[in-house]
Amino acid sequence: MNEIVITDTDFCRFRDYFYQKTGIFFENSKRYFVDKRLLQRIELTEHQSFRGYFTYLRFQASGEELQAVINALTVNETYFFREISQLESLVEEVLDDIVRHRPGELIRIWSMPCSSGEEPYSIVLFLLEHWPKLEQVDIEIIASDIDTGILQKAAQGIFSARSVKNLPNSSLNKYFSLRADGSYQLIDDIRQSVRFTQTNLNNRAEVQKLGAMDVIFCRNLLIYFDDISRRNAVESFYEQLNPGGVLFLGHSESMSRISSIFHVKRFRKSTGYYKPHKGKSDEKSNGR
């Protein structure tokens, strides 16, 4: 078998196609990473050239190969209690404010992308340990990702010792079981408290099907988008949030260069982006 080469033109064609489907744009600096994953897919599907493979990718009726490529090219690295200051703001300020404005109503929290589950499960554990009102308030936690393989892993709730390194021993003993290989598995009650669903943030219809949200965590995803995709994602989040809802981004991400649609919400320990109640304005729009 001749060595398959991905030319500059091939890379650009694939990059444009992948961007169209996912909103994720690969800079030239990611070329080696993309080429390596594509060559693996070409070999696994037994194609003899990039051209033949790319035709197969675009026109396969089931879309299974596109999903396989998405799974291969999305980055999934996270751990429990990452950016814990946002979780502290959630239980100390955000949820209480929502309850004041909408007493007795269901509160919905969305983790997007949820990766292998550390973020949504962290939310569950933090609520259990630090929000006394949890027993009186109905909360639904939805976790989404574009990667079907990582969603299956998340639902299993099995994590490495590195992934749980920030958890106190009391939480490990209370909510996890230690497996023979040194990994940790969440107990059934915790795993069943999160609803996992595949969602492509670039597909507005898929997002709308999830329904209205009160809090959205979208951390360290928008850095992989270009300006247009970032703006579209932020507008989609704004549409999904109930008035009074809050969006949390990653610590290295800022709304200031994306959109002015949200209002900055400075909590005691972190910063979020707020969809104001009608007729109210907490802080100036388009902050950092």
Swiss-Prot record:
Record-listed S-adenosyl-L-methionine binding positions: 76, 78, 82, 119, 145, 200-201, 219-220
One of the Pfam families matching this protein, by short name: CheR_N
An MF annotation (GO) of this entry: protein-glutamate O-methyltransferase activity
Top enzyme class: transferase
Keywords (A to Z) from UniProt: Methyltransferase, S-adenosyl-L-methionine, Transferase
EC number: 2.1.1.80
Purpose of the protein: Methylation of the membrane-bound methyl-accepting chemotaxis proteins (MCP) to form gamma-glutamyl methyl ester residues in MCP.
Name listed for the protein in its UniProt record: Chemotaxis protein methyltransferase 2
Gene label: cheR2
